[in-house]
């Protein structure tokens, strides 16, 4: 039981330290992250669509 409490205490300490180091992103950083995420989603969708089209053409739908 003491080991579990020590592990929880250590986790809390490390999490708190990481939280204090982080900062809220500014608007430009947020927009850049949103654009990159959106482009990634679109790219994955296009790849999936191309795989589906190739599958339909090869297997005959």
Curated annotation (Swiss-Prot):
<comment type="subunit">
    <text>Component of the Sec protein translocase complex. Heterotrimer consisting of alpha (SecY), beta (SecG) and gamma (SecE) subunits. The heterotrimers can form oligomers, although 1 heterotrimer is thought to be able to translocate proteins. Interacts with the ribosome. May interact with SecDF, and other proteins may be involved.</text>
</comment>
<feature type="topological domain" description="Extracellular">
    <location>
        <begin position="56"/>
        <end position="61"/>
    </location>
</feature>
<keyword id="KW-0653">Protein transport</keyword>
<feature type="topological domain" description="Cytoplasmic">
    <location>
        <begin position="1"/>
        <end position="34"/>
    </location>
</feature>
<keyword id="KW-1133">Transmembrane helix</keyword>
<keyword id="KW-0812">Transmembrane</keyword>
<dbReference type="InterPro" id="IPR023391">
    <property type="entry name" value="Prot_translocase_SecE_dom_sf"/>
</dbReference>
<dbReference type="GO" id="GO:0009306">
    <property type="term" value="P:protein secretion"/>
</dbReference>
<dbReference type="InterPro" id="IPR001901">
    <property type="entry name" value="Translocase_SecE/Sec61-g"/>
</dbReference>
<comment type="similarity">
    <text>Belongs to the SecE/SEC61-gamma family.</text>
</comment>
<keyword id="KW-1003">Cell membrane</keyword>
<feature type="transmembrane region" description="Helical">
    <location>
        <begin position="35"/>
        <end position="55"/>
    </location>
</feature>
<dbReference type="GO" id="GO:0008320">
    <property type="term" value="F:protein transmembrane transporter activity"/>
</dbReference>
<keyword id="KW-0811">Translocation</keyword>
<keyword id="KW-0813">Transport</keyword>
<dbReference type="GO" id="GO:0006605">
    <property type="term" value="P:protein targeting"/>
</dbReference>
<dbReference type="GO" id="GO:0005886">
    <property type="term" value="C:plasma membrane"/>
</dbReference>
<keyword id="KW-0472">Membrane</keyword>
<comment type="function">
    <text>Essential subunit of the protein translocation channel SecYEG. Clamps together the 2 halves of SecY. May contact the channel plug during translocation.</text>
</comment>
<dbReference type="InterPro" id="IPR008158">
    <property type="entry name" value="Translocase_Sec61-g"/>
</dbReference>
<dbReference type="GO" id="GO:0065002">
    <property type="term" value="P:intracellular protein transmembrane transport"/>
</dbReference>
<protein>
    <recommendedName>
        <fullName>Protein translocase subunit SecE</fullName>
    </recommendedName>
</protein>
